[in-house]
């Protein structure tokens, strides 16, 4: 993220709006597994819902987080053309996105189901004009750049998109065709006959595409756009953006065929022809955070790398603590080795959204109090510790200490929380280790790696879509089997000394970090308490484990 010039939040795809997708296991090579933090040969699932985006406010928080990590990068939000998209786009603009991409139904996602490609979505023209009109009427048009895609192939398409309000244009399928794609729509099968979309080394040798071919394509398209602009009497593309008055609906040759009224697409929300659209050249500022003060206070750490400990009182309006600091740590030390706990922030109070989001190795956040949603989102090597206020009389194992969607997409690092987590805990965790004392519904969904230890009850739908990693649950009520999918997961008691030692080590670490009385009770009575734990593992990775779940060689049926 630190090196990006633009970051795109893909809310949906034009070719299959509202649908997810998957990468079949036979396409998950060693290289892809490394990049995706997953297991070789195990199917990767891309779910339809965004578990961290349930409202415009959630999207605004994600944009805010990304701008803390890299304030120089543009943030683009991809929306699918649909009825009522103007209202959504207005919210996205208010959320301080820099670019809004309107995607049409003609997109060339070759792995999409044919029913979706043929019948789902609407043309980008309908979505683009509505968005341009709504943003203009609400005084938001100058705050964002409008971009469109979905079957744009020629200079005429580009010119029409510009007249309808677009300032930028994506040409994906057309570029692939220039590189050799012949549109056989076998992208999901690993059998692309021209080597464009396959991991098969023999087929990849057939790939004949070069950068020059794409340059030639774009040169011809640009020339066609120039000719159209000249015919209209203008000299620059910027001069025709939003000029729908230069468009008109043409007849299809007969009155009974002209039953489609496109006048709504040709309405100019701003009638003043002198209004200029292409004027959003900067990047929307996300505002200041506590991290800016922390960075100033940590000047000696950045100068000498010496171990540093800082103390702050926080409130729930202090959002994204540690993210901008993590960006500075990465840019300062890069790939040089930095020890754990090299800089520690001791926080007291209620931390706001996204505590420790993207936190890197070397950074430790210790909170005495509680935290809101998104704790440890995309955790990247850092450590987060939460425990109740030392004067609190509540029992940690019976109370919630952090909100929803915590450890979402974490790749490495640690989270220890003396209390319950909310819903959607550790979704898409792919390498981090975390110990909490209970969680809500949809825990460990789509998880591909790492370790999750729940010292308490879980909600329903635990481990749905989980294809990697290991989970341990303290099954007090003996009803965990009703909250998990038996078809995809193996769940059983601890039947291996190796995994028992792993579990006990994690709980010991949890106690050492949080002083949890609940964890201490389990450790002190280990011989009787270990039998209450359930170990959960995806069936797909059973042959890839460092140690088998059961020590003896005889197969035992999972409980």
Residue spans of the language-model regions?
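Catalytic cores of large soluble enzymes that bind and process phosphate-bearing ligands
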Residues: 1, 20, 27, 47-58, ...
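Generic structural marker for isolated residues within well-ordered, non-membrane alpha-helices
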Residues: 63, 225, 530
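Alpha-helix capping/termination and helix-coil
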Residues: 70, 132-135, 139, 225, ...
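A glycine-rich phosphate-binding loop feature that marks nucleotide/adenosyl-phosphate handling sites
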Residues: 79-87, 145-156, 178, 234-250, ...
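Long, distal/terminal scaffolding or interaction modules
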Residues: 203-204, 215, 228-232, 241-244, ...
């Amino acid at each position: 993220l630190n090196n990006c010039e633009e970051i795109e939040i893909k809310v949906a795809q034009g070719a299959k709006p509202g649908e997810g997708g998957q990468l079949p296991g036979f396409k998950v090579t060693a290289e892809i597994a490394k990049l995706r933090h997953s297991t070789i040969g195990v199917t990767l699932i891309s779910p339809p819902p965004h578990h961290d985006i349930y409202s415009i406010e959630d999207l605004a928080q994600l944009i805010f987080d990304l701008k803390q990590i890299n304030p120089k990068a543009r943030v683009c939000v991809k929306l699918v053309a649909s009825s009522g998209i103007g209202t959504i786009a207005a919210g996205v603009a208010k959320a301080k996105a820099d670019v809004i991409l309107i995607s049409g139904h003609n997109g060339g996602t070759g792995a999409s189901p044919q029913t979706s490609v043929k019948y789902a979505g609407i043309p980008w023209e309908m979505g683009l004009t509505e968005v341009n009109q709504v943003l203009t009427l609400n005084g938001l048009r100058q705050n964002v750049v409008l971009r469109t895609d979905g079957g744009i192939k020629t200079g005429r398409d580009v010119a029409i998109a510009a007249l309808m309000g677009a300032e930028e244009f994506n040409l994906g399928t057309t570029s692939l065709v220039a590189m050799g794609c012949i549109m056989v729509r076998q992208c999901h099968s690993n059998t692309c006959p021209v080597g464009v979309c396959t991991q098969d080394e023999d087929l990849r040798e057939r790939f004949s595409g070069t950068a020059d071919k794409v340059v030639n394509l774009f040169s011809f398209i640009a020339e066609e756009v120039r000719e159209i602009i000249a015919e209209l009497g203008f000299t620059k593309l910027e001069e025709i953006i939003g000029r729908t008055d230069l468009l008109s609906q043409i007849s299809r040759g007969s009155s009974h065929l002209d039953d489609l009224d496109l006048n709504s697409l040709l309405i100019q929300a701003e009638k003043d022809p002198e209004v200029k659209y292409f004027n959003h050249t900067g990047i929307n500022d996300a505002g200041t955070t506590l991290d800016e003060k922390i960075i100033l206070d940590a000047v000696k750490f950045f100068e000498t790398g010496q171990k540093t400990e800082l103390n702050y009182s926080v409130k729930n309006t202090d959002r994204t603590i540690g993210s901008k600091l993590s960006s500075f740590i990465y840019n300062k030390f890069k790939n040089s080795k930095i020890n754990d706990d090299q800089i520690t922030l001791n926080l007291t109070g209620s931390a706001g959204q996204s505590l420790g989001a993207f936190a890197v190795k070397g950074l430790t956040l210790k909170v005495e109090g509680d935290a809101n949603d998104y704790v440890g989102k995309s955790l990247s090597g850092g450590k987060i510790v939460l425990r109740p206020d030392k004067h609190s009389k509540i029992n940690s194992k019976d109370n919630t200490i952090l909100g929803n969607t915590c450890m979402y997409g974490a790749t490495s690092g640690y989270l220890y929380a003396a209390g319950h987590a909310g819903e959607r805990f550790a979704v898409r965790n792919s390498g981090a280790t975390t110990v909490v004392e209970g969680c809500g519904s949809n825990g460990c969904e789509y998880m591909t790696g790492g370790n999750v230890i729940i010292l308490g009850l879980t909600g329903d739908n635990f481990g749905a879509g989980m294809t990697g990693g290991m989970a341990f649950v303290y099954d007090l009520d003996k009803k965990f089997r009703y909250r998990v999918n038996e078809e995809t997961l193996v769940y059983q008691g601890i039947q291996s000394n190796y995994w028992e030692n792993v579990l006990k080590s994690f709980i010991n670490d949890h106690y050492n970090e949080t002083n949890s009385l609940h964890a201490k009770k389990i450790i002190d009575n280990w011989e009787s308490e270990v039998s209450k734990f359930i170990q959960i593992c995806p069936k797909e990775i059973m042959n890839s484990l460092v140690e088998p779940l059961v020590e003896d060689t005889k197969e035992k049926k999972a409980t």
